[in-house]
Amino acid sequence: MIISAASDYRAAAQRILPPFLFHYIDGGAYAEYTLKRNVEDLSQVALRQRVLKNMSDLSLETTLFNETLSMPVALGPVGLCGMYARRGEVQAARAASAKGIPFTLSTVSVCPIEEVAPVMNRPMWFQLYVLRDRGFMRNALERAKAAGCSTLVFTVDMPTPGARYRDAHSGMSGTNAAMRRYWQAVTHPQWAWDVGLNGRPHDLGNISAYLGKPTGLEDYIGWLANNFDPSISWKDLEWIREFWDGPMVIKGILDPEDARDAVRFGADGIVVSNHGGRQLDGVLSSARALPAIADAVKGDITILADSGIRNGLDVVRMIALGADSVLLGRAYLYALATHGEKGVANLLNLIEKEMRVAMTLTGAKSIKEITRESLVPSPEFTSVLADLPAASAKPKQDDAA
């Protein structure tokens, strides 16, 4: 199969993966309205073409949390990566490190912190949820710090799991799920050999290290369901600051007021995100939410964005809408499932090339030159910004908590 875009990796991954794994990452919450709008809204953002600008010295390099990135992209946290390729987190981390960008390890990764961090030539990022088991949280933070992780990505949009109907149909959950998964595995021989047989242990490495016993897929579903904490508040983040003195990024912001709260709290960054449309269906796409949030807090806090990003054009669009950098999720997992580390490396090269083309043809020589001026207020773009809540003034210095 010819691979020329991220969409090709998705098609390839669908053939390789057992349905329960493909649909787990490909699907969203409820009717998947927000999942679709993430991609559609972003694709409607029109770039302003400029010519004769002498783009010979174009650079994608940027700085984020005192780290130099070869381009404004990081691999975001995705659970169960090691079920999509043999020791998947390790392979993805190697590809990111070789490209000069961050890799973010999920709390619910297959490979533990101690296995992934050493393969990188730059500090790893670590993602954490607020969970009822505060002992686990403290243990994870201490281990991440000991492994040299530089940045904590704190996911706050999962006080309860979203309703993902696809999972019940695909075999990830529901009646006779284990038997259905087994049958799917034996009928997908490439995955069965690479991951099913040779990718063991199929374990939640970070959780197993804490509990002192193996944890499989059923444990993953049950442990998380019982540990998400609906009482989460800003006080929990204050508690985390006792154990983490590095950069902290709050992931799951969709409202300008929450963004202002993150500034008041003293967070180093936010991720404008709806969890890839996997939590609450019907909320704003990240592309719709981002401009008002940027108007409210740009310059006061680092802004990252995810959800709906499929190529280098989308990266440029998100930056023009107000992001400083972006996180990739599904796009790199499809590539990982298809060709492992080489697939992720190739995807990142494709994204870089697409960004260079977009920047060359919009006259932006550097990431800082990608602004709202890089966009044209076409009918499609206007529809993306329509009905956004008006951004009020930034909080005064005296208002900071």
UniProtKB/Swiss-Prot annotation:
FMN binds at residues 106, 127, 155, 251, 306-330. Its cofactor is FMN. Keywords: Cell inner membrane, Cell membrane, Flavoprotein, FMN, Membrane, Oxidoreductase. One of its GO terms (molecular function) is FMN binding. InterPro entries: Aldolase_TIM, Alpha-hydoxy_acid_DH_FMN, FMN-dep_DH, FMN_HAD, FMN_hydac_DH_AS, LldD. Substrate binds at Y24, Y129, R164, R278. Transmembrane segments: none annotated. It is a peripheral membrane protein. It catalyses: (S)-lactate + A = pyruvate + AH2. Residues 1-380 form the FMN hydroxy acid dehydrogenase domain. Its EC number is 1.1.-.-. It is found in: Cell inner membrane. Coiled coil: none annotated. GO terms for biological process: aerobic respiration; lactate metabolic process. It comes from the Bacteria. PANTHER family: L-LACTATE DEHYDROGENASE (PTHR10578:SF85), S -2-HYDROXY-ACID OXIDASE-RELATED (PTHR10578). Belongs to the FMN-dependent alpha-hydroxy acid dehydrogenase family. Catalyzes the conversion of L-lactate to pyruvate. Is coupled to the respiratory chain. HAMAP family: L_lact_dehydr. This is L-lactate dehydrogenase.
